[in-house]
Amino acid sequence: MKHNYKKYLLWLLLFLPACLMAQNKEEKMPGHITKVQKLEDVNVTGNRPHFIRLKGYYRSYQTNDSVMKYFNDGIVEYYINLKNGKTDLNAYSKRNLHNSRLVSEDKKRAFMVSDKGTFRPWPEEKTLIEQYRKKYQLKDSLGTQLVLLNQQKIGSIQTDSTRNICQIEINQLPTYKNLTHQLFGYTQTDIYDHVVEAYQISPEDYYSFKDLLFQKSDNSYLFSHKKDKQQQLIHVITELYITEKEYVEKKQSIKQDSSTPKESAAAITDFCNSNKIPALPEATEQEMQQLTPYNPANMKEIKE
């Protein structure tokens, strides 16, 4: 039995990543720069400001065995401290949705490890370009810089001088020391992890989160408890679109968001339309519309 399980797991690890990449090759490894809105140039006059404020929209959604289980999105403001690089967040018009049927089917155990993989992006510390320029070899190739690990391509850095945009794409899986993690009888095996960041080009060829335009992570993993008969294939996509940036002297606090789910949905729709945020694929949008609002503090559903 153990031999068959190991054989099955090995087959999944070998076969599924290839399937996922083949089915979504254009989306996951596009080979071209993502269509993002170029922001207006921001000039600094007078004293050096303390913060840069980035405003934008994020969405993060998860499928379990190809059925949507969680969807979270909202409008965000990041205040990046220009001295130490630390980031503070204001979030409003937040929307938290889940598939009540799938959530109700989660088995309650003495030690629960949630399968929830959605998250709110947090641009802080080092960008992908900063990390990978220091850690790995870069090689020029036909106007593109290839990112190499042990002479194998794991990503690329592309520049569009016409639009003044630079983009880095990385397949992070080859950089992992361990693909399998275990806790309280649960096992998670990573099988795909692809990230993208796009920046406005800076004159000094240095990219920090103050130049960020777009960020995306796309990852898949197998998840199960030791008592489960089979593993679930979990797929999580998280995107962040920056729509405004400005230098400011201090952070602005906002009142706690008391919007109802309907009010948040309306505000998010208006914001996305006004800022030309790319729409979800039609099938994904339809699945999202079937989900139920919930309170992330206690996971209870919100009745309107």
Question: Can you say where each PLM-predicted feature lies in the sequence?
Answer:
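Bacterial Sec-dependent N-terminal signal peptides
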Residues: 1-28
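Surface-exposed, low-complexity/disordered segments
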Residues: 24-304
